[in-house]
Amino acid sequence: SLQTVAGEVGGATPEAHGSLAAAELVRSGARDPDALALAEPGLVADLAGWHAVFATNALTVVYDPDSEYAPAIREDWRTALAREEISVGRTDPARDPLGYRTLLALDLAGREGAPADAIRANADVFPETQLLRTLEAGGVDAAFAYRNMAVAHDLPHLDLPAELDLSDPRLADHYRRAAVTVGGETIRGEPIRYGAAFLTDRGEPFYRNLVANAERLREYGFGVPDEFPVVRGRESDPAANTGTATRPRAPATAADQPVEHGRDNR
C-alpha cells in the first residue's frame, strides 16, 4: 500500500485515510502534512496547487479463500455477490474514491447484464482501512478493493475485465458512460490514477521516494506507465527521475489506498 511505501522512508510518519477524508482533514486544518498522496489527483491539486500523477490501479474482487462460498465466487462473481447468503464488503462513496469507483464499476457491469442493483444492496459498507481486515477476520466473504490492497494483504482476488476495472486509459470514453451521485454531485467513471505533492521542503524527499520508484510501486500492485510521473501545475518538474512517502508536520496525511477525479461541475 502507499502507507507501506511511505513507512519505509526514515523519519516519515504516514497516516492512512480514504482520500476524501484525508483531503477534508487538511482543508479543515485538522492535519498539516508535509506531503500528500491520494487516489484523486484533483484533490491534491486543490490542496497543493500542483500535483504529480504517478501510478494507476485496478478494481478487483477480493475473497476469503476459507469461505464456503469461495468456489462460487471464483466461478461467477457477478451471480455470487448478488446472493443474500454471501456477505460482501465495499467502502463508503462519500468517504473515499474506492467507494464510488466500486459503484461506477457496478454501473458498467449492470449495462452488460450483471445484477448490479442486487450486488450493491447486498454489500455492507466499511471504512477503507478496515475493509480487508474484516474479510481476513471472516466478517465478509468477498469485497471490492484495489489490486494493490489484495497484494498487500496477500489475499486471492479476481481481476475484473478491463471494461469494468477502471484501469485502462484507452477505455476512458467507455468508463465515462457510468455515473453515480454522491452528496448531490455527479461523478463519472475515469481511469484510476494517483496524485502526490509536497507542501513543504521537508516533505520533498518523501514525495520523491514515493514517485520515483516505479519498480517498487509495481511490486506492491500499482501500475506505473512509462510516461509517469506526469507533473501538472508547476513550471519545473520536481518529480523528474524521483517521488514521496507522505510525511506531515503533525502526523503525515496519506491515503492508504489511494484519475483525475471525474466530478462534473467541479
Spans of model-derived segments:
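Exported/periplasmic ABC-transporter solute-binding proteins
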Residues: 1-7, 20, 65-266
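N-terminal segment of the mature folded domain
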Residues: 1-89
